[in-house]
Amino acid sequence: MTRFARIIGTGSYLPPKRVTNDELAAQLAEKGIETSDEWIVSRSGIRARHFAEPDVTCSDLAVRAAERAIEAAGIDRSELDLILVATSTPDFVFPSTACLVQQKLGITNGCAAFDVQAVCSGFVYALATADKFIRSGAYRNVLVIGSEVFSRIIDFSDRTTCVLFGDGAGAVVLQASDEPGILSTALHADGSHANILCVPGNVAAGAIQGSAFLYMDGQAVFKLAVTVLDKVAREALAAAELDASQVDWLIPHQANIRIMQGTTKKLGLSNERLIVTVDEHGNTSAASIPLALDVAVRDGRIQRGQHVMLEGVGGGFTWGAALLRF
C-alpha cells in the first residue's frame, strides 16, 4: 500500500510590531533615504511588514507557529518523530534552530531535529524532505517550520531591499496516511547564480569578514524567478499526472506581486486562484509559504480535497515546488 504524507494541521505567527510603508518611509527619511508608499507598492505590492523586537529570536517565532500547528493537528507534541526548521536567520551558527525549538516545546522523546537552509525555497525543501522520510516509513509525524527574522540582516541604508522584507513563522504537521496528501515535489539549485542574492559575509576567527547584510540584484532575480517557477510547477504537475487547470490554489513564495502574477499567468491560471499575503507580510523568506497557507486554511478558502501548488525560489540559487491534495 502506498504511504503518503498529509498535512493535518497548520499554524503561523507574526510579531506584533506592524510597520506600514508610510511609517518605514518616515524612518528612512530621517536618514536621508527617500521612498514612499506608492514607490514600494508599485514595485512589490507590499503595504506593510512585521518586525520582531530585538530580544525575540527565530526560534521564538518558530515555537509560536508550531504550537498553533500542533493544536490544529490534534496530536500530542510527544508524538512528533522529526522537527525540521527552514531558516536563513538562525539563532546561532549552531546548535540548530530545530533543536532549540524542540527544547522550547518541551519535547523530550529524543526525536530527530535539524535545519534546512535554502533561503526563500527553504520551506518547500523542508516539506519535500519530510515527505520522503514519511513515504519511506521512517517517521509518522513530522513538524515542518519556516521561520525568519530578516530584519536582522537588512541594510536600512539600501532602499531597494530594506522595504521588502519582514519577520514571521509558519508551520505544518505532516502525518503518514493511506490517503493522498503530498502528490509530488521537485527541487533544483544552480550555484552559478549564488552572487545575485546573498549575505556575502562570513565569520572567521571571531570576526565578520565582508558584509553581514543582504545583497540582491533585483532584476536578475526577477528574470530567473519567473522562468524557473513556471518550469518547476509544470514538473510537479507532470509527476502527479495533473494539469494546471486542476490546481485550485497557487501559493508561491511571497516576494513580489509581479513575480507571483507572472507565474500565475504562465500557468494559465486566474489571479483569483492566487493566495496573496505579501501585501501585509512582506517577504518573509522561508516563512512566507506556510504563513500564506495557514491564512488561507483558517479563512476557509482552502478546503479538504483541493489541489494546492506550493512553489518557492531563493538564494543559492534554489527553487522547488510541492503539489498536494489538501
UniProtKB/Swiss-Prot annotation:
Region (ACP-binding): 254-258
GO molecular function, one term: beta-ketoacyl-acyl-carrier-protein synthase III activity
Signal peptide, first to last residue: none
Pathway as given in its UniProt record: Lipid metabolism; fatty acid biosynthesis
Enzyme class: transferase
Record keywords, A-Z: Acyltransferase, Cytoplasm, Fatty acid biosynthesis, Fatty acid metabolism, Lipid biosynthesis, Lipid metabolism, Multifunctional enzyme, Transferase
Subcellular location: Cytoplasm
Pfam families to which the protein is assigned, alphabetical: ACP_syn_III (PF08545), ACP_syn_III_C (PF08541)
GO process terms (BP): fatty acid biosynthetic process
UniProt family annotation: Belongs to the thiolase-like superfamily. FabH family.
Annotated domain remarks: The last Arg residue of the ACP-binding site is essential for the weak association between ACP/AcpP and FabH.
Function: Catalyzes the condensation reaction of fatty acid synthesis by the addition to an acyl acceptor of two carbons from malonyl-ACP. Catalyzes the first condensation reaction which initiates fatty acid synthesis and may therefore play a role in governing the total rate of fatty acid production. Possesses both acetoacetyl-ACP synthase and acetyl transacylase activities. Its substrate specificity determines the biosynthesis of branched-chain and/or straight-chain of fatty acids.
Record's protein name: Beta-ketoacyl-[acyl-carrier-protein] synthase III
Organism, as annotated: Ralstonia pickettii (strain 12J)
